[in-house]
Regions:
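Short glycine-rich, Thr/Ser-proximal phosphate-binding strand/loop in the N-terminal lobe
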Residues: 2-46, 117-126
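Short glycine-aspartate micro-motif
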Residues: 3-7, 55-58, 96-99
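Glycine-rich phosphate-binding loops at beta-strand->alpha-helix junctions
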Residues: 61-62, 207-230, 244-245
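Conserved phosphate-binding/catalytic loops in two-lobed NTP-binding clefts
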Residues: 74-81, 227-250
């Protein structure tokens, strides 16, 4: 029995395939990622190429698309909140809170004993505080988002960025440049604005440590550093998976295995 978890997000889609293993129960045999693009159905078929499972569990914005694709195997769905909670707890069973910052949304999840979901909050109505915010504002500095975090870490004094609207934040950054503020300091201020918003979300759901930080934005070194400092968290209380953007797909696959009984 091969179970695939697919997480179809607005920016990318991830696949995790798990199979029974005599030593450990289940093991991950496939991990893949593709951009979602404007044709998510085609991309999903490419993602599954040469590894068609016996069962699929889909999560993310596009999970309903997978059910309509006539893939010839049973397909079910699981909510993003539950999938990300399962993925985080698989890596870190001691986790008490999960923060997932993706391309278009931010999820803060408080966990109950046993990894069950307690309170949660999700910002999915605008790009503020998400990977899209970083991607958009990075263009002001004429650089790609992959380099933006390291550049922001060169800053020494972060100006306060008051607007969390992506468009207005770009205008504010441009205005600060015109005032002679160092670009690397502005970049640091933009990162700090995300962290402030995120920490407020975490506190509203009832932050407890250890905190698992996942999602594509967890790859940003500046966000990681600022979040740890803002929370006063050490390496034992702020936990980051080796592949932080695979958590949703992993959680979906885990859900599929669990629901088999």
């Amino acid at each position: 029995m091969r179970i695939a978890g697919i997480d179809i997000g607005s920016r990318s889609m991830e696949l995790v395939v798990r199979e029974p293993d005599s030593a450990s129960g289940w093991t991950t045999t496939v991990q893949r990622r593709l951009p979602t693009t404007f044709d998510p159905v085609r991309q999903c078929r490419l993602l599954l190429e040469d590894c068609m499972p016996d069962r699929i569990v889909a999560t993310g914005y596009g999970r309903a698309l997978v059910q309509d694709m006539d893939l010839g195997v049973p397909v079910e769905t699981v909510t993003e909140i539950r999938a990300h909670a399962l993925g985080a707890c698989h890596h870190f069973p001691q986790a008490r809170t999960v923060l997932d910052i993706g391309g278009q949304d931010t999820k803060a999840i408080a966990l109950l004993p046993g990894g069950k979901v307690g309170r949660f909050e999700m910002n999915d109505r605008c790009a503020a505080g998400t990977g899209k915010f970083l991607e958009y504002t990075a263009t002001v500095f004429q650089m790609d988002v992959a380099s933006f975090g390291a550049y922001a870490m060169l800053g020494t004094e972060a100006p306060v960025i008051n607007s969390m609207c992506t468009v207005f934040a770009e205008t504010e950054a441009t205005s600060l440049m015109a005032q002679g503020v160092k670009p690397e300091n502005i970049a640091l201020g933009l990162h700090q604005s995300i962290v402030r918003r995120t920490v407020n979300m975490l506190r509203r759901v009832g932050l407890e440590f250890p905190l698992v930080f996942a999602g594509g934005v967890a790859n940003n070194p500046c966000i990681r550093d600022l979040l740890a400092r803002e929370l006063g968290a050490d390496s034992g209380s702020l936990l980051i998976p080796d592949e932080p953007d695979m958590g949703g797909a992993l959680g979906a696959a885990l859900w599929g295995a669990t629901s088999l009984g």
